[in-house]
Regions:
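Substrate-recognition/cap regions that form aromatic- and gly/pro-loop-enriched pockets
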Residues: 340-429
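Acidic/His- and Gly-rich active-site-bordering loop/insert found
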Residues: 2-102
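Active-site-adjacent substrate-binding region
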Residues: 218, 225-227, 232-248, 392, ...
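Zn-dependent metallopeptidase/amidohydrolase metal-coordination segment
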Residues: 7-11, 335, 342-355, 418-476
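His/Asp/Glu-rich mid-to-C-terminal helical/loop segments that flank catalytic regions of hydrolases
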Residues: 223-240, 269-272, 317-324, 332, ...
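Acidic, glycine-rich active-site loops and adjacent beta-strand->loop/helix elements
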Residues: 76-78, 139-147, 169-172, 211, ...
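Midchain, well-structured core segments that form catalytic/ion-binding scaffolds
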Residues: 102-105, 145-146, 152-364
Length: 484
C-alpha cells in the first residue's frame, strides 16, 4: 500500500509532500519556503517572522465566527539520524517512506513523523472547505529539536488565540498538560598528544546495535548510552594495558540517546592477544547486563592503521575519569506524578581528536532548581579534569494547569468519541508550550498526537490507525470550541 492511499488521505498526502522537502534542524530554509508558498497558494494571510517561524491565519468556517480563536502549533524541523550503513544526505534528500504492516517508517533514517504528522494535519485543516472550525492561527515553529529557537524567538502580539493545541505528543491516548525544561551542558578542553609508541598495534573499537531513542521520553527505559559504554571499555582496559587513545567519535544530537561510538586506539603489540580476550569478555559482560533492553548490543574490534599521535597518558586518565563520573540517565523521579521522570541527563556526544575534546549533554527537569543542581554536578565532574564548562539554551518547563477550560473540552471530546477517559499527563521532554507561554501567559494549552515509537532514531515509526484517530479527535475539538 502507498502512503497516499492511507486515511485520512489529505493528511497523508501532505505528509508525503512535506517529507519530500529536506528539513533537518538548523537547515529549515527549504521547508520555510515550502510552508510560506503553501499558505499563499491558499490565499491565506501568511507571515514569516524574523526567526523563521511561519504563521498562517484562516477565518472561521461558516457559522463558527463567534467561537474563540484556536492556535494550531507544530514544528517544521526533524531530527536527522541515520544508521551508519545508510547513505543519505538530510540537507538535500527527501525521506524515503514505506508502509510496514500497521506502521509507516523510513528506510534507514528518522521518519519525521515527529512533528511532521502534526504539520500535515494543520495543512489539511487550512486546505479544507468542509471542516467546521473557529478562526485558526497556524503556527509552524523552527528548530524545536536542537534549541527551541523558533519558540524562543516568537514575539508577543502576533497571536490572538484563546487556546493553543500543540500536536507533538506521541501516544494517542494521552493529553499532555506539562513538560520538563532543559539546558545544554557543554564541556571542552585541549590535551597534549605524543608520538604513537613504536611497538604498538592499532584498532578501531566500535560500540553498535544500541536502541537509541528520545533522551527525554526514553531515558527511563534502561537503554544503554554508547558514550558511557565506550568510556567504560576504555577506562577498564587502560588500567590493564598500555592503551592510548587517538580518536573518539560517539553519539550525535543532544536529544537522542547515543546508539553508536567509535574509537581509534593502540596497545602494545606484546599485549595484543590479552587485550583482544579482555574486549571479548567485556562484550559478553555488557551483553549479559543489557540482555533485555539492548538485545542487539555489540562491540567490534578490528585492526587499523597506526595513527601518528595519541593522547598523553595522564590527560587521558583524567578525561576517562571525568566521563565515567559524569551522571547519565534518571537523576530524580517526580514526587507528585507517578512514574514520571523529574530530572535526567543525556551524555549525547563525545568528540576527541587532534588535541581537542568536546562533550555535549542535555539536562532536563520539571524543576528549575533540580535542573541547575544536576547541571552543576556534571560541571563539577568535568572541571576536576580541567574542562571548561558552559550552559546554553536553557528553557523553562510547562507548568500543568489541571483546571484549564481547554483541558475540560479536550477530555470531553475524547470521551464522547472513544468511550474512554484519556490519560492526562506531563512528560519528560521539551515541548514548546512552556516557552510559548512566557509571551502568551493567558493562552491555555494542551498537547496531543498520534502514536509514534522510536522518535529521534532510525527506528522511528508512526501507527497508521492512531493517525486516523488523532485526526477525528482534532476535528471534534475544533467543532466544539466555545463561543467568545
Amino acid at each position: 500500500m502507498k502512503i497516499t492511499e492511507l486515511e485520512p488521505k489529505q493528511l497523508w498526502a501532505n505528509f508525503a509532500s512535506l517529507n519530500a522537502v529536506p528539513r533537518p534542524s538548523k537547515k529549515e530554509e527549504k521547508v520555510i519556503a515550502f510552508m510560506v508558498a503553501f499558505g499563499k497558494s491558499l490565499g491565506l494571510d501568511t507571515y514569516q517572522d524574523e526567526t523563521g517561524n511561519v504563521i498562517i491565519k484562516k477565518p472561521a468556517s461558516a457559522g463558527m465566527e463567534n467561537r474563540k480563536t484556536v492556535v494550531l502549533q507544530s514544528h517544521l524541523d526533524m531530527v536527522h539520524q541515520k544508521n551508519n550503513d545508510t547513505v543519505f544526505d538530510f540537507s538535500t534528500e527527501g525521506i524515503k517512506m514505506l508502509v510496514d504492516g500497521d506502521w509507516v517508517r523510513a528506510e534507514g533514517t528518522t521518519l519525521g513523523a515527529d512533528n511532521g504528522i502534526g504539520v500535515a494535519s494543520i495543512m489539511a485543516i487550512l486546505q479544507s472547505k468542509d471542516i467546521a472550525h473557529p478562526a485558526i492561527e497556524a503556527l509552524f515553529t523552527i528548530d524545536e529539536e536542537t534549541g527551541m529557537t523558533g519558540a524562543k524567538g516568537l514575539k508577543g502580539g502576533l497571536l490572538s488565540g484563546a487556546y493553543l493545541l500543540n500536536l507533538d505528543t506521541e501516544e494517542d491516548d494521552e493529553i499532555d498538560i506539562g513538560c520538563a525544561g532543559g539546558v545544554d551542558v557543554s564541556a571542552f578542553r585541549e590535551y597534549d598528544t605524543i608520538p604513537t609508541p613504536t611497538e604498538a598495534v592499532a584498532y578501531t573499537l566500535s560500540v553498535k546495535g544500541l536502541h537509541g531513542g528520545h533522551s527525554g521520553m526514553d531515558i527511563h527505559k534502561g537503554y544503554a548510552n554508547a558514550n558511557k559504554l565506550m568510556n567504560r571499555l576504555l577506562f577498564t582496559c587502560s588500567e590493564k594495558f598500555d592503551l592510548h587513545i587517538a580518536e573518539i567519535n560517539g553519539g550525535g544530537l543532544r536529544n537522542a540517546i547515543p546508539r553508536e561510538s567509535v574509537a581509534i586506539i593502540t596497545v602494545d603489540k606484546n599485549e595484543k592477544e590479552a587485550f583482544e580476550k579482555e574486549i571479548a569478555q567485556l562484550t559478553l559482560d555488557l551483553q549479559h547486563e543489557y540482555a533485555v533492553t539492548e538485545p542487539t548490543l555489540n562491540v567490534l574490534l578490528s585492526p587499523t592503521a597506526l595513527p601518528e599521535r595519541v593522547m598523553e597518558i595522564e590527560e587521558q586518565e583524567d578525561v576517562l575519569r571525568a566521563i565515567y563520573a559524569a551522571f547519565n540517565g534518571v537523576y530524580k523521579m517526580s514526587q507528585s506524578i507517578a512514574d514520571l521522570v523529574e530530572t535526567s541527563n543525556n551524555i549525547a556526544r563525545v568528540e576527541l581528536k587532534n588535541g581537542e575534546i568536546n562533550v555535549y549533554c542535555l539536562t532536563r527537569s520539571a524543576s528549575e532548581t533540580s535542573k541547575n543542581d544536576l547541571a552543576d554536578t556534571i560541571r563539577a565532574a568535568f572541571e576536576l579534569a580541567g574542562f571548561e564548562v558552559e550552559y546554553t539554551g536553557s528553557y523553562p518547563g510547562w507548568e500543568p494547569k489541571v483546571d484549564a477550560e481547554i483541558l475540560k473540552i479536550v477530555k470531553e471530546q475524547y470521551e464522547n468519541l472513544f468511550g474512554e477517559t484519556p490519560q492526562v499527563v506531563a512528560c519528560h521532554a521539551g515541548l514548546e508550550c512552556g516557552i510559548l507561554g512566557t509571551n502568551y501567559p493567558t493562552m491555555e494549552m494542551v498537547s496531543f498526537g498520534p502514536t509514534i515509537k522510536g522518535a529521534h532514531s532510525p527506528a522511528e515509526r508512526v501507527n497508521i490507525a492512531s493517525v486516523e484517530k488523532f485526526w477525528k479527535f482534532l476535528l471534534s475539538i475544533l467543532k466544539n470550541i466555545p463561543a467568545k
